[in-house]
């Protein structure tokens, strides 16, 4: 991509996209990756987020621009009262920008240090959890849950912001430059689950449990008036390895939480959220909502499955959002009910029946998973790994980083797929759809 210009937008200036012309009212905030402005068109007020593309190294710009566009796509695609909605996207002198909902009620950081009764605390948590649920239902993991990314509209409804883009960049910097990057990159580390920041586990599949962990840390901070379970940020910066060891050993300050909680159920919730092992945390957002006393949202009835149903896997998150793999057509063309999934190798594009593109990460194995169609119940089953020959020995070999379905790990014995299920393979999520 061409070199972006270093720009600053002044109050009163105009920003034009293909859809509209906006007037800049004032600057709302500035960070290392970009700036946010309050803007208006002829009728409404919005927020405009501009990336400082000129601050990135040339080899980083393509990835960042792609991730930024993904965040816009997520925000424009998902209709939820608990997620900041995206309305417009364009470029300004080589710097991408998006136009979003304007949230005038501040963010959750503004409430840290205040005292809440049980009802008010539950209401705040409910809105955050509903936003996470709506993201997870679409196969999107936020991966950067912290108070600054929980905004409030003028009705004090919490809304999730900054999903997808900053987490991706920060996570990569954190792993690649573990001891020497800017404070802004590392600020997320105190909320991150161990598997996100540990280089030995960084390539493992990330599912809803990633956000569950960060939610637990954030609620601990809110309840205790600004404390963090494993110690303050300065301790993290002073000795990251020691801080991460405390996460691993689950050595956190329960006393502060017990003393501060308006309801002791929060001790139970947070204790489970910040378990070291992902499988020991809550598996779904609905489980936390249930503990809080909220009835699970009634899901739409799953469509009936028939022998003639056409099964599709749709990419929800990854390099090729929106791409669809037609399982029924692939099965018929192969005359086989067994399909393989793995990393797309451009030098050998027919290694798998379904090759998943992965340009900036290395999560997907060459031979990652297997889909098998059952003529008995007309459903597909997914198994981790593939039957193949390795070092001259035939056998079933599992993938390096695993497969998740609805946030639960799948082994080689397989799991039955249902319409609406979310499959996570590496950093890519696929939604099961039938026509």
Segments from the language model and where they lie:
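Activation segment signature within eukaryotic-like protein kinase domains
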Residues: 124-125
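Protein kinase catalytic-loop region centered on the HRD/HxD motif
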Residues: 130-140
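Activation-segment/catalytic-loop signature of the eukaryotic protein kinase fold
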Residues: 89
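AlphaC helix of the eukaryotic protein kinase fold
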Residues: 58-77
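Protein kinase glycine-rich loop
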Residues: 25-31, 36
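C-terminal boundary/linker segments immediately following FHA domains
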Residues: 341, 377-379, 383-384, 389-435
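Intrinsically disordered, low-complexity acidic Ser/Thr-rich regulatory segments
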Residues: 286-363, 372-377, 418-419, 428-435
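Conserved short submotifs of the Hanks-type protein kinase catalytic core
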Residues: 93-107, 111
